[in-house]
């Protein structure tokens, strides 16, 4: 196990640096990752009959998208002002308060590939949400959104992710067509 020290940190619930996370992403055998993940799960929830879940809320950042996928709701073009939206901070505030009142502690933020929402928009949004709700976890932006933000902001992926994390991003969801087989993805998007 060449990644033993990284696994030890994970099992001790110590945060991983981006470089270490990239190292295990590039080099760790899947079986090792599964073993570490299961060990960590058993450590946190020893009873094998107990399953836990996350209470969160999905809030769409915008429905404006230049991608043109056939399967999702992020389909408005910027000029379609009668249907296009960007969620306001007041709407976030209301929805987060509702979520917290129900025992939730995480916000899942996703949206389309808006041609005018670059890194500055997301940094400001994440900082404001964390300022208002410091304990809220932000689980936000799929891989296509991060790539889009990087491209229109003229940044590399690593810089984009580091800046988003510094602004309050806690984790990335794995969702959308990017998780599908290449042939299926091409057919539907």
What are these regions (language model features)?
Residues 76-189:
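Conserved Radical SAM active-site core
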Residues 21-24, 55-58, 111-115:
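Conserved short loop/turn motifs at secondary-structure junctions
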Residues 1-31, 94, 100-101:
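Auxiliary Fe-S-binding modules of radical SAM enzymes
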Residues 34-78, 84-108:
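N-terminal pre-triad scaffold of radical SAM enzymes
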Residues 12, 26, 43-46, 101, ...:
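Secondary-structure boundary motif
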Residues 11, 19-20, 48, 54, ...:
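Residue-level signal for pocket-adjacent positions within structured domains
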Residues 14, 57-59, 72, 178, ...:
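Flexible, active-site-adjacent loop/turn segments at secondary-structure boundaries
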């Amino acid at each position: 196990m060449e990644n033993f020290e990284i696994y030890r940190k994970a099992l001790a619930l110590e945060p991983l640096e981006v470089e270490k996370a990239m190292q295990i992403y590039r080099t760790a055998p899947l079986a090792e990752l599964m073993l570490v993940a299961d060990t960590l799960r058993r450590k946190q929830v020893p009873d094998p009959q107990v399953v836990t879940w996350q209470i969160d809320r999905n809030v769409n950042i915008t429905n404006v998208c230049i991608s043109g996928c056939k399967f999702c709701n992020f389909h408005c073009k910027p000029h379609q002002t009668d249907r296009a939206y960007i969620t306001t901070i007041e709407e976030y505030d209301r929805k987060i308060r509702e979520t917290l009142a129900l025992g939730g502690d995480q916000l899942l933020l996703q949206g389309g590939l808006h041609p005018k929402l670059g890194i500055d928009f997301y940094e400001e949004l994440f900082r404001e949400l964390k300022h208002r709700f410091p304990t809220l976890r932000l689980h936000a932006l799929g891989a296509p959104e991060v790539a889009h933000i990087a491209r229109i902001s003229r940044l590399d992926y690593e810089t984009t992710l580091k800046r988003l994390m510094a602004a309050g991003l806690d984790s990335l969801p794995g969702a959308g067509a990017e998780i599908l087989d290449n042939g299926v993805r091409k057919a539907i998007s």
